[in-house]
C-alpha cells in the first residue's frame, strides 16, 4: 500500500500560493474585459513573467515524435475509415501544438479555406489565437467552416492566454490570473456543478488544464466543441449521453458500426483517481514550484513527467524514494497495457467478423445488437487508453473500463458466431496480416503514398502562405 505523508515542504508549497494570491482572488476569477483584445503572442508576456515564459519555451525540448500506430498496428483496424488510421503520434511539448496539427495526416491537405476533411473545431486546443477569435467573432463565428479557414489566423502555440487573463492589471504585475478562455469549457464545468468563478484556487488550477485535456465532441451543423458531461463524467455516463443523442464520430469501414472516438480525457480520469479525490492538482505534479537563479519561487511551465522534478512533486507527499515509486507506476502501466492489447485483439476480430456477416447478407436488424456491443466495447477501451497517463491518474478505473470493454467485445463475438452460423459460416474468419502499420493500412485500403505526397505538398506550399499572411496582419512576431 502506498504510504502518504503531509510534510512541512508539502504544506509550505500549498500555503505559498494561497497567501500569495488570496488578495487578488476576486479579480482573478473575474471575466476578461470585453474591450481588450486577447493577445495571443506569447513572447509579449516575457517581461512580466520571465521565468514562466522561459520554462514554457523549454517545452520545445520535448520534441520526439512517437508513432503510436507503428507501435500498435491494431489501432489502424479499430479506426478504419477515420483519419486516426492514417496517423497518430503520442503527445509532445506544448511548443509543437500548432505544428503538429498542421502536419498530421489527419487534417488532410486542403488547397483553400473551404477545402479539407475537418472542421474549425480541430484548432480549439492548440493556440491562444482560438480565444482571440472567439472574443472577436463569437463562438458561432469561430466554429463556422473548415479547419483550413483558421490557418492564417491560428499561428501561435498553446500558451499564456489559454490559461491566464492576460488583459488584467494583476497579470501585468506578475500574478497568474487564471481563467477559462473557452466558453464551452466554462459551460461544461457549470454542468457538473463547478462554476469557475466559485471554485477554489486549487480546483481552478486543474480546471484550466481541463479545457483541453478532456473528452469532447463536435456538436451540431457548426461542429462546435461540447463536453459530453450532461449525464455525468464516468465512461458509462458519457456512453449513455452519446447513445441518447444518437451521436457517432464515424462509421468503421469494416464492421459498419457507428463509432465513438475518445480524445484525451485526463480531467475525467484524474477526477476518478486518488490524486483527484484528494485535490492533488495537475499543477502539483506537472508544473511544480521551483526556484530561479535568485532563489525566487515560480511555477515551472515546462509541463512534463513528475519524475523529472521528483523532489518538487512526488516527494512532497510520498515517503518512498524515486526508484520505488517508478517501479509501482511501471507495474500499473504494464497491467493496463496487457489488458489493453487483449481487448484490441478481441475488437480486431469483431470488426472483421462483422464484415463477414455483412458480406454474407446479415440485415441491419440482425447487426444492430452486435454493432452496439462493438461500439460500447471500443468506446470504453478508447476512453481508457486515450488518457496517456491513466496508469498514474486512475489505474483502478482504467482496468475497470478495460474489463467492461472486454466483456462487451466478447458479447459481440458470441453473437457474431451465432449469426454467422445461420449464414452457413462455421469456420474461423481469417484476419489479414496486420503485423505492421503499413500492412494494416493496406488491409483497410488506404493509399498512404498518395496521402503522404499530398500532405508534403500542403506543408511546402500552403503553410508558408498562412504564416506570411499572419505576419502581415501582425499575428506573429517578426
From Swiss-Prot:
Residue sites binding heme c 2 per the record: 160, 163-164, 301
Swiss-Prot/TrEMBL GO biological process terms: anaerobic electron transport chain; nitrate assimilation
Chain coiled-coil ranges: none
Record's GO cellular component terms: outer membrane-bounded periplasmic space
Pathway annotation: Nitrogen metabolism; nitrate reduction (assimilation)
Binding locations of heme c 3: 94, 209, 212-213
Keyword field: Calcium, Electron transport, Heme, Iron, Metal-binding, Oxidoreductase, Periplasm, Signal, Transport
Residues given in the record as substrate binding sites: 216, 264
Reactions catalysed: 6 Fe(III)-[cytochrome c] + NH4(+) + 2 H2O = 6 Fe(II)-[cytochrome c] + nitrite + 8 H(+)
GO function terms (MF aspect): calcium ion binding; heme binding; iron ion binding; nitrite reductase (cytochrome, ammonia-forming) activity
Residues involved in heme binding: 122, 125-126
Amino-acid positions noted as binding Ca(2+) in the UniProt annotation, renumbered to this chain: 215-216, 261, 263
Record has Calcium as a keyword: yes
Obligatory cofactor(s): Ca(2+); heme c
Cleavable signal peptide: 1-26
InterPro entries linked: Cyt_c552, Cyt_c_NO2Rdtase_formate-dep, Multihaem_cyt_sf
UniProt: heme c 4 binding residues: 282, 285-286, 393
UniProt KW Transmembrane keyword: no
Record Pfam families: Cytochrom_C552 (PF02335)
EC number: 1.7.2.2
Cofactor binding note: Binds 1 Ca(2+) ion per monomer. Binds 5 heme c groups covalently per monomer.
Localization per Swiss-Prot or TrEMBL: Periplasm
Protein name: Cytochrome c-552
Organism: Escherichia coli O9:H4 (strain HS)
